[in-house]
Amino acid sequence: MKLAFDDAGRGDCVVLIHGHPFDRTLWAPQLAALRDRFRVIAPDLRGFGRSPVTAHRVTMREYAADIEELLDGLGIGPAAVVGLSMGGLVTMELAAFQPERYWAIALVATTMQPPTPQDRATRLERAAAVERDGMAVLVDYMHTGVYGPACPPSVRARVDAMMDAAPPEGAAAALRGRAERPDYRPLLAGLDIPALVCAGSADPWSDEPVTAEIVASLRRPETVIIDGVGHLPNLEAETEFNAALGAFLRAHAPG
């Protein structure tokens, strides 16, 4: 799978993996902040942005394999991976499959838990609705929790436009893939690399218990909770998020 991607800067490599139903432009502030010190790769996952769409279902392992293929094609060896929401699931797939390849990971607004039977059924129903009725179905759902109470209107407008532009087939395929995600807790219990765990205190999905469970499941966690923001701390609290992520990456970079 040939992914569209941005490639900026020089130095130790950092890969930024967006969530669902977004695209690589979600990371524009971080790419700008990190490119002076790192080589930053920000791909569009399969089915989003300018990457090809695969209909019906794409699993987290398939998204991860696309990233591995991209890094192999670019001749990139050790890298850090930063994933938000579904991108965090893909990050965990990468780290579980090839832990020796990554010098650090960052898990932002995500979960290690497998879906419950009800969650699985809901995602499958929502996938069918998105295919039938378009992205408005998913955007309406995202509005129930994606933004914190003080999210700037400019961020809302930008993210709404990003979600509206997502291909319905790609978004539905991701929903079905997420419905089949594994339990990452045992897969990452022995992971011996630094792991930044970041969430917003007003995120109803990656809430305090979910985030605490991620921290408890890792050997070398570092935790950042950003007060008052929702599911997109990298945009709602750009300055604070960039400072925390940059400090973490600089502290653990091999170069």
Identify the role of each PLM range.
Residues 191, 197-199:
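Short beta-strand/loop motif that positions the catalytic acidic residue
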Residues 221-255:
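Catalytic active-site module of serine/aspartate enzymes centered on a nucleophile-bearing elbow/loop
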Residues 201-206:
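Acidic catalytic loop of the alpha/beta-hydrolase fold
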Residues 64-79:
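Conserved acidic catalytic loop of the alpha/beta-hydrolase fold
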Residues 115-121, 132-190:
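Conserved alpha/beta-hydrolase catalytic His-Asp/Glu region
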Residues 6-56, 60, 70:
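Conserved HGGG/HGGXW glycine-rich cap/lid loop of the alpha/beta-hydrolase fold
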Residues 193, 207-216:
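Short alpha-helix in the alpha/beta-hydrolase fold that links the catalytic acid
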Residues 77-116:
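Conserved hydrolase catalytic core segment
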